[in-house]
């Protein structure tokens, strides 16, 4: 013990006699992005754990946002039966989410620029998660619709902010390309999962279709807090008034169309809702003309080609949404499919739409956008015409049902690509982001607006044929037959809307070269090369 102490004492005396050398100064550690942080003992051929965590956090929100726009479709009949919803209330379970999601999307993106994208993203995910709990415990129509409205607000805050976080979290090159690809893939995966997983969970209880969001949301919040970094804040005046007025105008219009068939088109509540929609729309135009940072810059609408393109995008989004909802309700209400079978039966539609998107992406540089859009519109028209004549109670899945949804899916996919690229054709580099966001907003808002009209047609036709509204479990054979004919009659209106989209495309004057250039610029931006 003494020898040990003497040794220690000798070492200390030797080190004390040496000249003192200050420790070298380490450069301050800069804040690193998720893909730049080294992982000691982690295989170099695999993405880093930080990269994976960031991708899961950002891509997960896009997955949930897409899932919840489709999951309610297969759950609607059971929700209507358990909560005794009217047909108007049933439609609101879907449209409430899409209205606030689409209407507040642009505001959500700018909110991230103003107060920080990481903070905004976490707030949006938290609101979405809490709203999912409220959806699951809803005890009547009002609470469920309010919870769905809140869910849409959460998605509108988190989803566009998540896309912006891809650019600030991952450096240019393979890391950002991979993250962008994952983010884009979540849309397609979410569409399928919303139908299949939603259908499977609905077989147990429709409430589980919303509760499944809760653990995923909590994991995303944790990963976002640990794997994402905060961005610089910009001083920007938010056009909250414009975004709220636009959402209010669309909501009031949808409400008027949804209650018109049951309450009467000349009833006080229907006319009042229409007047509110008109007043909100006029106020929106006035506000946008004077706003410092308008949600919708009106100078983008001075180009006739772009104005027609935006109108076609609005209607095409409505056609796609209405087709999905109408077929989803038809196979359960009339054909008696279970929720799971209905969800699985829709997978060919998603695959067909992907095929249409791929084919159109290859042809868009060779043919003018009007040719591809008209071709897609006529494919959809033929599919809906076929469905209106050959779909009836007791028909087999193949070919009577699978034929129209596959052909219709290809048609929609063919029309979407040229319309989306036409929206950004000829605009400046700094305007591509805002114009793309406006196109996405119009596509989202087109869904509830067109569905409200189609649902009003179906309800009016049902009542005209001696049927009734409400849960199908209370209907007799005569009333079910009336509802059957009303659904197929509604498909004729969807077919008519597809023809109108094709007619609008006749007035789109962009050339294949302009659209091909827009496609190249967009791909370069998505890849982080510009």
From Swiss-Prot:
The chain crosses the membrane at residues 51-71, 92-112, 120-140, 151-171, 181-201, 204-224, 240-260, 267-287, 307-327, 344-364, 371-391, 401-421, 438-458, 489-509. Residues 1-11, 28-38 have a biased composition (Basic and acidic residues). Pfam families: MFS_1 (PF07690). SUPFAM superfamilies: MFS general substrate transporter. Residues 72-91, 141-150, 202-203, 261-266, 328-343, 392-400, 459-488 are extracellular. One of its GO terms (molecular function) is transmembrane transporter activity. The keyword Cell membrane applies. It is found in: Cell membrane. Keywords: Cell membrane, Membrane, Transmembrane, Transmembrane helix, Transport. Induction: Expressed during infection of macrophages. Down-regulated by the nucleoid-associated protein Lsr2. Residues 1-38 are annotated as: Disordered. Its main location: membrane. It comes from the Bacteria. It is a multi-pass membrane protein. One of its GO terms (cellular component) is plasma membrane. Residues 1-50, 113-119, 172-180, 225-239, 288-306, 365-370, 422-437, 510-530 are cytoplasmic. Disulfide bonds: none annotated. Belongs to the major facilitator superfamily. This is Uncharacterized MFS-type transporter EfpA.
């Amino acid at each position: 013990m003494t020898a040990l102490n003497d040794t220690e004492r000798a070492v200390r005396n030797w080190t004390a006699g040496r000249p003192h050398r200050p420790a070298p100064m380490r450069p301050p550690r800069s804040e690193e992005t998720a893909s730049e942080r080294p992982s000691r003992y982690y295989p170099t051929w695999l993405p880093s754990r930080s990269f994976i965590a960031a991708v899961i956090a950002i891509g997960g929100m896009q997955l949930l946002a897409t899932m919840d726009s489709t999951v309610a479709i297969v759950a609607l009949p059971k929700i209507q039966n358990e909560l005794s919803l009217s047909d108007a209330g049933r439609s609101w379970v879907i449209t409430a989410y899409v209205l606030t999601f689409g209407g507040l999307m642009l505001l959500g993106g700018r909110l991230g620029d103003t107060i920080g994208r990481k903070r905004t993203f976490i707030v949006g995910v938290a609101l979405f998660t809490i709203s999912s709990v409220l959806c699951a415990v809803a005890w009547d129509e009002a609470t469920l619709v309010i919870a769905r409205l809140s869910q849409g607000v959460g998605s509108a805050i988190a989803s566009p902010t998540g896309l912006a976080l891809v650019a600030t979290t991952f450096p240019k090159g393979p890391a950002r390309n991979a993250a962008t690809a994952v983010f884009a893939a979540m849309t397609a995966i979410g569409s399928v999962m919303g139908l299949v997983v939603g259908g499977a969970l609905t077989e147990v209880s429709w409430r589980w279709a919303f509760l499944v969001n809760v653990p995923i949301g909590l994991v995303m919040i944790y990963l976002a807090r640990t794997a994402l970094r905060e961005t610089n804040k910009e001083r920007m005046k938010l056009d909250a008034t414009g975004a709220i007025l636009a959402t209010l105008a669309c909501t009031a219009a949808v409400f008027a169309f949804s209650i018109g068939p049951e309450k009467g088109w000349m009833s006080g509540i229907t006319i009042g809702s229409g007047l509110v929609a008109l007043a909100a729309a006029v106020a929106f135009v006035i506000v946008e003309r004077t706003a410092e940072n308008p949600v919708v810059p009106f100078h983008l609408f001075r180009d006739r080609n772009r104005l027609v393109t935006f109108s076609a995008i609005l209607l095409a989004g409505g056609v796609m949404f209405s087709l999905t909802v109408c077929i989803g309700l038809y196979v359960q209400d009339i054909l008696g499919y279970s929720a799971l079978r209905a969800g699985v039966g829709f997978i060919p539609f998603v695959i067909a739409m992907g095929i249409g998107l791929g084919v159109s992406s290859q042809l868009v540089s060779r043919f003018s956008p009007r040719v591809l859009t008209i071709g897609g519109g006529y494919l959809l028209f033929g599919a809906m015409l076929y469905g209106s004549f050959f779909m009836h109670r007791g028909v087999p899945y193949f070919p009577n049902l699978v034929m129209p949804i596959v052909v219709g899916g290809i048609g929609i996919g063919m029309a979407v690509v040229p319309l989306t690229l036409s929206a950004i054709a000829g605009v400046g580099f700094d305007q591509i982001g805002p114009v793309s966001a406006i196109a996405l907003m119009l596509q989202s808002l087109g869904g509830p607006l067109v569905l409200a009209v189609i649902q009003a047609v179906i309800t009016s036709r049902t009542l005209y044929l001696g049927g009734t509204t409400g849960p199908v479990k209370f209907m007799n054979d005569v009333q079910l037959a009336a509802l059957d004919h009303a659904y197929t009659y509604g498909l004729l209106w969807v077919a008519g809307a597809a023809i109108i989209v094709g007619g609008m495309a006749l007035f789109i004057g962009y050339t294949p070269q302009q659209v091909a250039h827009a496609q190249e610029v967009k791909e370069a931006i998505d890849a982080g090369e510009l």
